[in-house]
Swiss-Prot record:
The encoding gene: argS
Name listed for the protein in its UniProt record: Arginine--tRNA ligase
Subunit structure, interactors included: Monomer.
Substrates-to-products reaction catalysed: tRNA(Arg) + L-arginine + ATP = L-arginyl-tRNA(Arg) + AMP + diphosphate
Motif residue range(s): 'HIGH' region: 122-132
Keyword Ligase attributed: yes
Species name: Enterobacter sp. (strain 638)
GO aspect biological process, one term: arginyl-tRNA aminoacylation
GO CC terms in record: cytoplasm
């Protein structure tokens, strides 16, 4: 049930009947304060200006055409021409009841699209670090939301599995296998990469061999392809452990690395030349873009092939967008890549559009995000100033959560404690990130993220168990409430019901904007409203059975909404804390 969409349609019809153009924007929003009703329509001012009418006069005319019978019990004009809409308690009650009868809590499915989501993208032969965390968990929350809404989502893990470094890595892997006379487990990927680089920098013969291996690998030599595959397999197996720990839905089947697009690159360069988009410049192949200027104010040159014949990331990204449209048949492509890559992506996509590889009707969206900072406001590092490994971060989260849970539950059996600590620790790391607007940098702070107050995972997980405890105390089976009526007589009941019915609107925003923090804010607000409702509207000691059962149903929908909302974020819920 999308009340905002329903009201937008009704207000739009009334505006048109009052003389507004057919494309007028009703601007229906959720009200910020209860005294302004549940929704406000703010579109009158803009339309009044176009029509040359006083806004309040137009608002009064709109009201004569506005049919909200059975939806709102009060509609009033406020200020210069805002229309405040108060939802009818009977309307709220019937839709709460309908939501409880639906597995999807009454959430409708929009027209299904094929949506490619590019996220995570670690590098081969390197261990995942905290820099991969934001793309991985924000992208996965978007994927879960889009899938819940019924879209066909193609996860694209654009791993760095190609490039000149593979000559060096294969040469070192070969050396290790010869010296160790057997299979080598790349347990320490960082160490392996570091040692390979050291050999490359200090041993001229090794470096020469590495360079020759690049040529052989790129030429498709089977031995070198096999060595390359081994490096990719070992890396992705290790990454999968991190994905599993993070409760992220990526699997090996979602890997679409840079190597996938490599065979397309010569054809793309030739095609861009044929279309007169690319030209030779100082031995390299360059696309000059009028949309971007260099320091001299001239069109910026984007290199797509170097003098030595090598290709660049831009060339790969052009091929990648083309592949996603032509082969994967994407209706929309979302890229969860940090904000520093914005200009690079925009330039690649400008070339893609000019070449006609992806039509304008297919959005290419950079859902960029800021950096993860330490308490000092600088990039998050180890005490020694190194990069924080993702596995170390998750280990610490688990250890801190274990101590926290044990302190609050000294008698909890070890197995249950471990399960709860995992849900709280991993949930805390993810939620701390997801609850911030992704476009900004955010401060990583253990104390804040593991707090049981405020907009945190432990608070949200606790809020969920608190709602469930009502049913344990009532000693009632939820199915016994199926035929009970929802009756809304108190303001707190109405406020909670209205917020519960805004779940679909929240999902719609997350799906459209790729902003999971909107869902976090909604769930936090919902938990707060339930708290006020629980305090002021006695459930188990209600005046009569009708009120008791009705309030239990509001509690039931609150629990289901919290659980489903947290699930779209990839945050695990627990039954007890």
């Amino acid at each position: 049930m999308n009340i905002q969409a329903l009201l937008s349609e009704k207000v739009s019809q009334a505006l048109i009947a009052a003389g507004a153009p057919a494309d007028c924007e009703p601007q229906v929003r959720q009200s910020a304060k209860v005294q302004f009703g549940d929704y406000q329509a703010n579109g009158v001012m803009a339309v009044a200006k176009k029509l040359g009418m006083p806004p309040r006069q137009l608002a009064e005319l709109v009201l004569t055409h506005l049919d909200l019978n059975g939806i709102a019990n009060k509609v009033e004009i406020a200020g210069p021409g805002f229309i405040n809409i108060f939802l009818d308690p009977a309307f709220l009650a019937s839709h709460v009841d309908a939501a409880l009868k639906s597995e999807r809590l009454g959430v409708a499915q929009p027209k299904a699209e094929t949506i490619v989501v590019d996220y995570s993208a670690p590098n081969v032969a390197k261990e995942m670090h905290v820099g991969h965390l934001r793309s991985t968990i924000i992208g996965d929350a978007a994927v879960r939301t889009l899938e819940f809404l019924g879209h066909k989502v193609i996860r694209a893990n654009h791993v760095g599995d190609w490039g000149t470094q593979f000559g060096m890595l294969i040469a070192f892997l070969e050396k290790q296998q010869q010296e160790n006379a057997g299979e080598m487990a790349l347990a320490d990927l960082e160490g392996f990469y570091r040692e390979a680089k050291k050999h490359y920098d200090e041993d001229a013969a090794f470096a020469e061999r590495a360079r020759s291996y690049v040529v052989k690998l790129q030429g498709g030599d089977e031995y070198f392809r096999e060595m390359w595959r081994k490096l990719v397999d070992i890396t992705m197996s290790q990454n999968q452990l991190a994905y599993n720990r993070l409760n992220v839905t990526l699997t090996r089947d979602d890997v679409m690395g840079e190597s996938l697009y490599n065979p397309m690159l010569p054809g793309i360069v030739a095609d861009l030349k044929a279309k007169k988009l690319a030209v030779e410049s100082e031995g390299a192949t360059v696309v000059f873009l009028d949309e971007y200027k260099n320091k001299e104010g001239e069109p910026m040159g984007v290199i797509i092939q170097k003098k030595d014949g090598g290709y660049l990331y831009t060339t790969t990204d052009i091929a990648c967008a083309k592949y996603r449209y032509e082969t994967l048949h994407a209706d929309r492509v979302l890229y969860y890549i940090d904000s520093r890559q914005h200009q690079h992506l925009m330039q690649a996509w400008t070339i893609v559009r000019k070449a006609g590889y992806v039509p304008e009707s297919v959005p290419l969206e950079h859902h960029m995000f800021g950096m993860m900072l330490g308490k000092d406001g600088k990039p998050f590092k180890t005490r020694a100033g190194g990069t924080v490994k993702l596995s170390d971060l998750l280990d610490e989260a688990l250890e801190r959560a274990r101590r926290l849970v044990a302190e609050k539950n000294p008698d909890m059996p070890a197995e249950e404690l471990e399960k709860l600590a995992n849900a709280v620790g991993i949930g805390a790391v993810k939620y701390a990130d997801l609850s911030k607007n992704r476009t900004t940098d955010y401060i990583f702070d253990w104390d804040n993220m593991l707090a049981f107050e405020g907009n945190t995972a432990p608070y949200m997980q606790y809020a969920y168990t608190r709602v469930l405890s009502v049913f344990r105390k009532a000693n009632i089976d939820e199915s016994a409430l199926a035929n009970a009526a929802v009756v809304i007589t108190e303001d707190r009941e109405a406020q909670l019901a209205a917020r519960l019915l805004q779940f679909e609107e929240t999902l719609t925003v997350v799906a459209r904007e790729g902003t999971p923090h909107v869902m976090c804010s909604y769930l936090y607000d919902l938990a707060g409203l339930f708290s006020g409702f629980y305090e002021h509207c006695p459930i188990l000691s209600a005046d009569n059975e009708e009120a008791r059962n009705s309030r239990l149903k509001l509690a039931q929908l609150t629990a289901k909404t919290l659980k489903l909302g947290l699930d779209t974020l990839g945050i695990e819920t627990v039954e007890r804390m």
